Amino acid sequence: MPKAAAKSKTTGKVEKRRAKKDPNAPKRGLSAYMFFANEQRENVREENPGVSFGQVGKILGERWKALSDKQRAPYEAKAAADKKRYEDEKQAYNAEADEEESS
């Protein structure tokens, strides 16, 4: 059984070790903003050639904040559908994991 925490040799502080993430676990659902950003990122790069990655993110954030609720609705719908997909996949994944554990 792995240790939950270990003292760091350099600072003496207790460090928590993260559990290894299962590569077969379902991917989390994207937020409405992430759907918007993924769709608009290329447009922002074309309109602002030579800007840094961070600046692209700032511009996307400003554009997202400027959207009305009506303009955000399609992205919110995509996010809700993706959340449902994630919950369904996670439920199936957990059922499969419980089944393997009991075997």
From Swiss-Prot:
Feature: compositional bias, Basic and acidic residues: 70-91
Record-linked SUPFAM superfamilies: HMG-box
Alphabetized UniProt keyword annotations: Chromosome, DNA damage, DNA repair, DNA-binding, Nucleus, Transcription, Transcription regulation
GO cellular component assignments: chromosome; nucleus
Alphabetical GO biological process terms: DNA repair
Region of interest called Disordered, as start-end residue ranges on this chain: 1-30, 70-103
Recorded superkingdom: Eukaryota
Stated role: DNA-binding protein that induces severe bending of DNA. Required for DNA-binding by the FACT complex, a general chromatin factor that acts to reorganize nucleosomes. The FACT complex is involved in multiple processes that require DNA as a template such as mRNA elongation, DNA replication and DNA repair. Also augments the fidelity of transcription by RNA polymerase III independently of any role in the FACT complex.
Protein name: Non-histone chromosomal protein 6
Positions of the DNA-binding region: 26-94
